[in-house]
Curated annotation (Swiss-Prot):
Keyword hit for Zinc-finger: yes
GO biological process terms on file: maintenance of transcriptional fidelity during transcription elongation by RNA polymerase II; transcription initiation at RNA polymerase II promoter; transcription-coupled nucleotide-excision repair
Name of protein: DNA-directed RNA polymerase II subunit RPB9
Entry's localization field: Nucleus, Nucleolus
Function: DNA-dependent RNA polymerase catalyzes the transcription of DNA into RNA using the four ribonucleoside triphosphates as substrates. Component of RNA polymerase II which synthesizes mRNA precursors and many functional non-coding RNAs. Pol II is the central component of the basal RNA polymerase II transcription machinery. It is composed of mobile elements that move relative to each other. RPB9 is part of the upper jaw surrounding the central large cleft and thought to grab the incoming DNA template. Involved in the regulation of transcription elongation.
Assembly notes: Component of the RNA polymerase II (Pol II) complex consisting of 12 subunits.
Stretches annotated zinc finger (C4-type): 7-32
GO terms for cellular component: nucleolus; RNA polymerase II, core complex
Binding-site list for Zn(2+) 1: 7, 10, 29, 32
SMART domains the record matches: RPOL9, ZnF_C2C2
Annotated zinc fingers (TFIIS-type), start-end: 71-111
Family note: Belongs to the archaeal RpoM/eukaryotic RPA12/RPB9/RPC11 RNA polymerase family.
């Protein structure tokens, strides 16, 4: 996580600057001459986390797809025990193996990490 750094002499914000001679990253005050070496070369990190890709491909007639496995997990919305499931398609470091269940009764999408009763797969 990137944080703001402040000058220990004048309390102004420090800005990143490259030391081209020694090829290192410094944080430097624009008001006084204070500078400190950065512990990491990371200045800014922008992570986009989206949930839209996880359920990509879910269509109205997903229940008629014979290639999808079926389970008897109870739907939290309509309590039906007829659903199909698939694994998350996201490929992020923080993504664990999450199964997405699609209820064939009400088309509700729910995940395997929600607390529920025992599931059997067929």
């Amino acid at each position: 996580m990137t944080t703001f750094r402040f000058c220990r002499d004048c309390n102004n914000m420090l800005y990143p600057r490259e030391d081209k001679e020694e090829q290192r990253l410094l944080f430097e005050c624009r008001t006084c001459t204070y500078a400190e070496e950065a512990g990491t070369p990371l200045v800014y990190r922008h992570e986009l986390i989206t949930n839209i890709g996880e359920t990509a491909g879910v269509v109205q007639d997903i229940g008629s797809d014979p290639t999808l496995p079926r389970s008897d997990r109870e739907c939290p919305r309509c309590h039906s025990h007829d659903n199909v499931f698939f694994q998350s398609q996201q490929r992020r470091r923080d993504t664990s193996m999450v199964l997405f269940f699609v209820c064939l009764g009400c088309s509700h999408i729910f995940t395997s990490d929600q607390k529920n009763k025992r599931t059997t797969f067929s």
